[in-house]
């Protein structure tokens, strides 16, 4: 049978908490099954409960909205959304042709999910909606993520000061 190590991981994290090196426990890139395993192990063995989950979340990447959103709501677990700009796609730079040579999707083509025909079409439609409402695509994309009730914080990445200013505006 399949054996997992959720209990062992939580025991080790409990020791790190007790040593004062960390205060709380979170997970990353986990699905609904794994999240529930962590929660059950914590509850059944008086171990630390996870309080955050760090997963990708954006207008173009929304699997969290399924079972994980319900788990997060019911168990009071906050989402730390990474890649809320879908690796820069939701800045509009790829469809506008202004992406630098060192842009992520040019350097890492394996992230093709954001440059598929469907993603490109969705990005064009989102850009139109943003412009019709007096926002940049980046501002609208971050506003969408920030308005989710299960969000604790988003994790933005900016290559320059101009991008950072637009992201926090």
Language-model regions, residue ranges each:
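Beta/alpha (TIM)-barrel catalytic core signal, keyed to glycine-rich beta->alpha loops juxtaposed to Asp/Glu
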Residues: 2-169
């Amino acid at each position: 049978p399949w054996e997992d190590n959720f209990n062992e991981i939580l025991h080790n994290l409990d020791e790190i908490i007790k040593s004062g090196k960390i205060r709380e426990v979170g997970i990353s890139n986990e699905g609904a099954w794994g999240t529930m395993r962590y929660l059950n192990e914590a509850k059944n063995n008086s171990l630390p409960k996870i309080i955050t989950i760090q997963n990708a979340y954006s207008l173009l990447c929304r699997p969290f909205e399924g079972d994980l959103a319900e788990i997060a709501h019911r168990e009071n677990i906050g989402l730390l959304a990474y890649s809320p700009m879908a690796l820069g796609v939701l800045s509009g730079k790829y469809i506008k042709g202004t992406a630098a040579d060192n842009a992520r999707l040019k350097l890492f083509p394996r992230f093709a999910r954001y440059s598929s025909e469907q993603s490109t079409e969705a990005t064009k439609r989102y850009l139109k909606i943003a412009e019709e409402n007096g926002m940049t695509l980046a501002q609208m994309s971050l506003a969408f993520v920030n308005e989710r009730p299960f969000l604790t914080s988003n994790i933005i990445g900016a290559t320059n000061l101009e991008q950072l200013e637009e992201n926090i505006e």
